[in-house]
A protein has these predicted regions:
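Sec-dependent N-terminal signal peptides
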Residues: 4-16
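A generic "folded-domain core" signal
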Residues: 19-129, 133-183
Length: 183
């Protein structure tokens, strides 16, 4: 009986589109067109470090990014998609792009999706797997990237720093790529 119960529970766990590897979730997203490999933030649980792979047969490119949840109700936050943001991540400072802003809780809070860009799968995942954590700090949101004008990140984000554990990263991305190749 215990064996049957174990098989049923295992079947239920594996029957959906999400597969867990300790501290990682792998699932199909965006109309089942992408595989998302994500983990929750250590400081703010609503923030996620995300890697996306398009289900295009090759599965050799990965988009690296994260979401930051903000309770600052700055009315300009909805104008941020497409803007560059200066961040510090993996020991480097660079400009990323704000890809989307989604209002939550009747619009008083927002989830901001920031992309670091597209990378070749193997090289990028090898680079990331060399670290134990991804510590991210948001510095500056550019209104005009060329002129260097804009706002301090704290104008839009109540929390400008978060960290993500990279424990089991290699296993998670391998499973994500396997799922991608099987579709």
């Amino acid at each position: 009986m215990k064996k049957l119960l174990g098989i049923v529970v295992l079947g239920l766990l594996l029957s959906g589109n999400a597969y867990p590897i300790e501290n990682w979730e792998i699932k199909k997203v965006i109309d089942n067109k992408y595989i998302e490999i994500s983990t929750e933030g250590l400081n703010v649980k609503g923030d996620k470090y995300k890697l996306l792979m398009k289900l295009n047969g090759k599965c050799d490119t990965i988009e690296d990014g994260f979401t930051f949840y903000t309770t600052k109700n700055n009315p300009g936050v909805m104008l941020l998609p497409g803007k560059k943001i200066k961040i510090e991540s993996m020991g480097k400072t660079f400009a990323s792009e704000i890809k989307a802003v989604v209002p939550v809780l009747s619009g008083s809070h927002h989830l901001v999706w920031i992309t670091n860009g597209l990378y070749e799968f193997e090289g990028h995942t090898n680079f990331i797997s060399q670290s134990e954590k991804n510590n991210v700090k948001l510095h500056f949101v550019f209104d005009d990237f060329e002129k260097g004008t804009g706002w301090e990140a704290k104008e839009f984000f109540n929390e400008t720093e978060n960290s993500w554990s990279l424990d089991n990263f290699s296993e998670a991305v391998k499973l994500g790529q396997k799922m991608c190749l099987e579709n």
